[in-house]
């Protein structure tokens, strides 16, 4: 399982490198477009522009694939963690069986306490891993941050995108934020329960 996790992370890194290379190639093609236009060679500029767009799309596709592989790696990491917790719970269950067969109430009570602690730890691990997996996917990226980054880049380059951003559905970011807050509150309560 650890080998699989390593391979997934390695593959994600390779895909990210391919995305960066495609982006670099796209910028090189854009420079060729500029040069061709300066030389009044519109036909060559059009070919270079097509290449630039193709390379840019290729880079975005590599990046999407890298994100998906990274999400799978997070799920495998969750499985590895859950395997360890499950093993610990199995050991506690065996100890409980032994204590019950001996009918020593103190041992039974001690084992039950350990078992309850393992169950609470499992809940916390599950919650944390689910949060990390959901944050690894691009679907849970806060829309407000995405919009802010787009506006920042547009302002730096003198581009107009505010009209396009205003066409997004209202409340797109609020749903993600309330979901994250409720998960954080739930996790905080569980952590407080573990401390007590």
Curated annotation (Swiss-Prot):
It comes from the Eukaryota. One of its GO terms (molecular function) is protein domain specific binding. Highly expressed in adult heart, kidney and liver. Expressed at lower levels in adult colon, spleen, lung, brain, testis and muscle. Also expressed in myoblasts and embryo fibroblasts. InterPro entries: Snf7_fam. One of its GO terms (biological process) is membrane fission. The modification Phosphoserine is found at residues 101, 173. GO terms for cellular component: amphisome membrane; autophagosome membrane; condensed nuclear chromosome; early endosome; endomembrane system; kinetochore; kinetochore microtubule; lysosomal membrane. A motif (MIT-interacting motif) lies at residues 185-195. The modification N-acetylmethionine is found at residue 1. Residues 5-42, 102-124 form a coiled coil. It is found in: Cytoplasm; Endosome membrane; Nucleus matrix. It is a peripheral membrane protein. Keywords: Acetylation, Cell cycle, Cell division, Coiled coil, Cytoplasm, Endosome, Membrane, Nucleus, Phosphoprotein, Protein transport, Repressor, Transcription, Transcription regulation, Transport. Pfam families: Snf7 (PF03357). Its main location: cytoplasm. Probable peripherally associated component of the endosomal sorting required for transport complex III (ESCRT-III). ESCRT-III components are thought to multimerize to form a flat lattice on the perimeter membrane of the endosome. Several assembly forms of ESCRT-III may exist that interact and act sequentially. Self-associates. Interacts with CHMP1B. Interacts with VPS4A. Interacts with VPS4B. Interacts with PHF1. Interacts with IST1. Interacts with MITD1. Belongs to the SNF7 family. Probable peripherally associated component of the endosomal sorting required for transport complex III (ESCRT-III) which is involved in multivesicular bodies (MVBs) formation and sorting of endosomal cargo proteins into MVBs. MVBs contain intraluminal vesicles (ILVs) that are generated by invagination and scission from the limiting membrane of the endosome and mostly are delivered to lysosomes enabling degradation of membrane proteins, such as stimulated growth factor receptors, lysosomal enzymes and lipids. This is Charged multivesicular body protein 1a.
């Amino acid at each position: 399982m650890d080998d699989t996790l390593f391979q997934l992370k390695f593959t994600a890194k390779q895909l990210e490198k391919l995305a960066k290379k495609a982006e670099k190639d796209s910028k090189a093609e854009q420079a060729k477009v500029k040069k061709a236009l300066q030389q009044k060679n519109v036909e060559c500029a059009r070919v270079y522009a097509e290449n630039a767009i193709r390379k840019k799309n290729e880079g975005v596709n590599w990046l999407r694939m890298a994100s998906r592989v990274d999400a799978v790696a997070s799920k495998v990491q969750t499985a590895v963690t859950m395997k360890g917790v499950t093993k610990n719970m199995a050991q506690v269950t065996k100890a409980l069986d032994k204590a019950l067969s001996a009918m020593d109430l103190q041992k039974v009570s001690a084992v039950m306490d350990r078992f309850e602690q393992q169950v609470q730890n499992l809940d916390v691990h599950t919650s944390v891993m689910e949060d990390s997996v959901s944050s690894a996917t691009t679907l849970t990226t806060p829309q407000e941050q995405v919009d802010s980054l787009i506006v920042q880049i547009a302002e730096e380059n003198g581009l107009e995108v505010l009209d396009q951003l205003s066409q997004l559905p209202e409340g797109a970011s609020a749903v993600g934020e309330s979901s994250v807050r409720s998960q954080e509150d739930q996790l905080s309560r569980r952590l407080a329960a573990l401390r007590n």
